Swiss-Prot record:
Protein name: Poly(A) polymerase catalytic subunit
Record's function text: Polymerase that creates the 3'-poly(A) tail of mRNA's.
One GO BP annotation of this record: mRNA processing
Species whose genome carries this gene: Camelpox virus (strain M-96)
Cited Gene3D superfamilies: Poxvirus poly(A) polymerase, N domain (1.20.1270.320), Poxvirus poly(A) polymerase, nucleotidyltransferase domain (3.30.460.60)
Pfam family, one: Pox_polyA_pol
Oligomeric form and interacting partners: Heterodimer of a large (catalytic) subunit and a small (regulatory) subunit.
Family membership noted in the UniProt record: Belongs to the poxviridae poly(A) polymerase catalytic subunit family.
Catalytic residues of the enzyme: 202, 204
Binding site for Ca(2+) 1: 202, 204
One annotated GO molecular function: ATP binding
Membrane spanning stretches: none
EC id: 2.7.7.19
Induction: Expressed in the early phase of the viral replicative cycle.
Amino acid sequence: MNRNPDHNTLPNITLKIIETYLGRLPSVNEYYMLKLQTRNIQKITVFNKDIFVSLVKKNKKRFFSDVDTSASEIKDRILSYFSKQTQTYNIGKLFTIIELQSVLVTTYTDILGVLTIKAPNVISSKISYNVTSMEELARDMLNSMNVAVIDKAKVMGRHNVSSLVKNVNKLMEEYLRRHNKSCICYGSYSLYLINPNIRYGDIDILQTNSRTFLIDLAFLIKFITGNNIILSKIPYLRNYMVIKDENDNHIIDSFNIRQDTMNVVPKIFIDNIYIVDPTFQLLNMIKMFSQIDRLEDLSKDPEKFNARMATMLEYVRYTHGIVFDGKRNNIPMKCIIDENNRIVTVTTKDYFSFKKCLAYLDENVLSSDILDLNADTSCDFESVTNSVYLIHDNIMYTYFSNTILLSDKGKVHEISARGLCAHILLYQMLTSGEYKQCLSDLLNSMMNRDKIPIYSHTERDKKPGRHGFINIEKDIIVF
């Protein structure tokens, strides 16, 4: 049975802080559990809710003007959340409320509140690219890779998109400009900045403070719409989180990376926004075509891929002076697969200082082998490459996270051979190594190719772990 703490035996200041926060005298259990949270509780208690309400209203006016909600409703929702602890008696839920309120009071103004003040002038930095000239070439390349056979019985996961995506996109455009040292974009929106004919859905981002940003954004949406917003963490995607509404509709997702990883990601500056260098994105696209699911996507909507591919090819032609003449020299590199040990050996001596690359299809096996090598110079680029790389005794060791396509028994399909080459080139770009000759040969190797059917494919590495989530309405954090 809980009893109220004795006023004479407990430090009055700490007790008073907790009592003020809870709106009641804490039980003995509440006191001893919450006293280490006193500093956070104090920050929450003295936080100026009126200024916060004003910032949320300004965010609403600028980015969510079409959402039908009144200023008084927004204020009521905010004040209700900041007094939620007064009606909560479960210690676990109290900890969750304190943690999330702490994020809001210490970060919201700098992360989202700042978007309401006058922005710096946009520095126009667009170059006129002749994307049309690359459309036929892109179509030819993609046509030769359009070899997936769709299993009509296969149940595809539905990706329902929230009606709020357009509002969040508007906010994200400004966010990317204000926070361009810590947040960059890639994917369709980044290519849209180069080619306005590109269609895009949500904006794909990499950032160094993903969790904090998503929590702040989730609360902004909650306070404006009144909807329950849930943040989810997917175990097989590294440092990935997604915001969904109460009906499981996708709003936005984000990958978190370290600052040292952010510093080495190749990027270009367009209209005050940093985007991942389209050369790097093109290599990632070529790598991803080794994934059987991505080839199935290609077969469903080839024109969407064509617009992206043509844009990136034109960028590469303009930026690196790549000549598309069909000269491919030693590409695809020779690839030999050991299906039992799930390792592909790639001959690299014609292009790089290391003579071969061992591409592991199981990450834990690679980690074990790196330990056995007693080498401590591996590079982990997190979700940027979804892989670790190590060069040791003229051999590259790396993890390849996609399927390997086979064109015959024991024979690596040229689509996967090119994907492995692209994976190696990602490392070269990230470490400022030589890549342009190999890039030229890789792209030229995709020209004038006949379709080669897929005989079979290896399975992807199965990632352990559990799904995590933050449920604001139910005061639950599971990570």
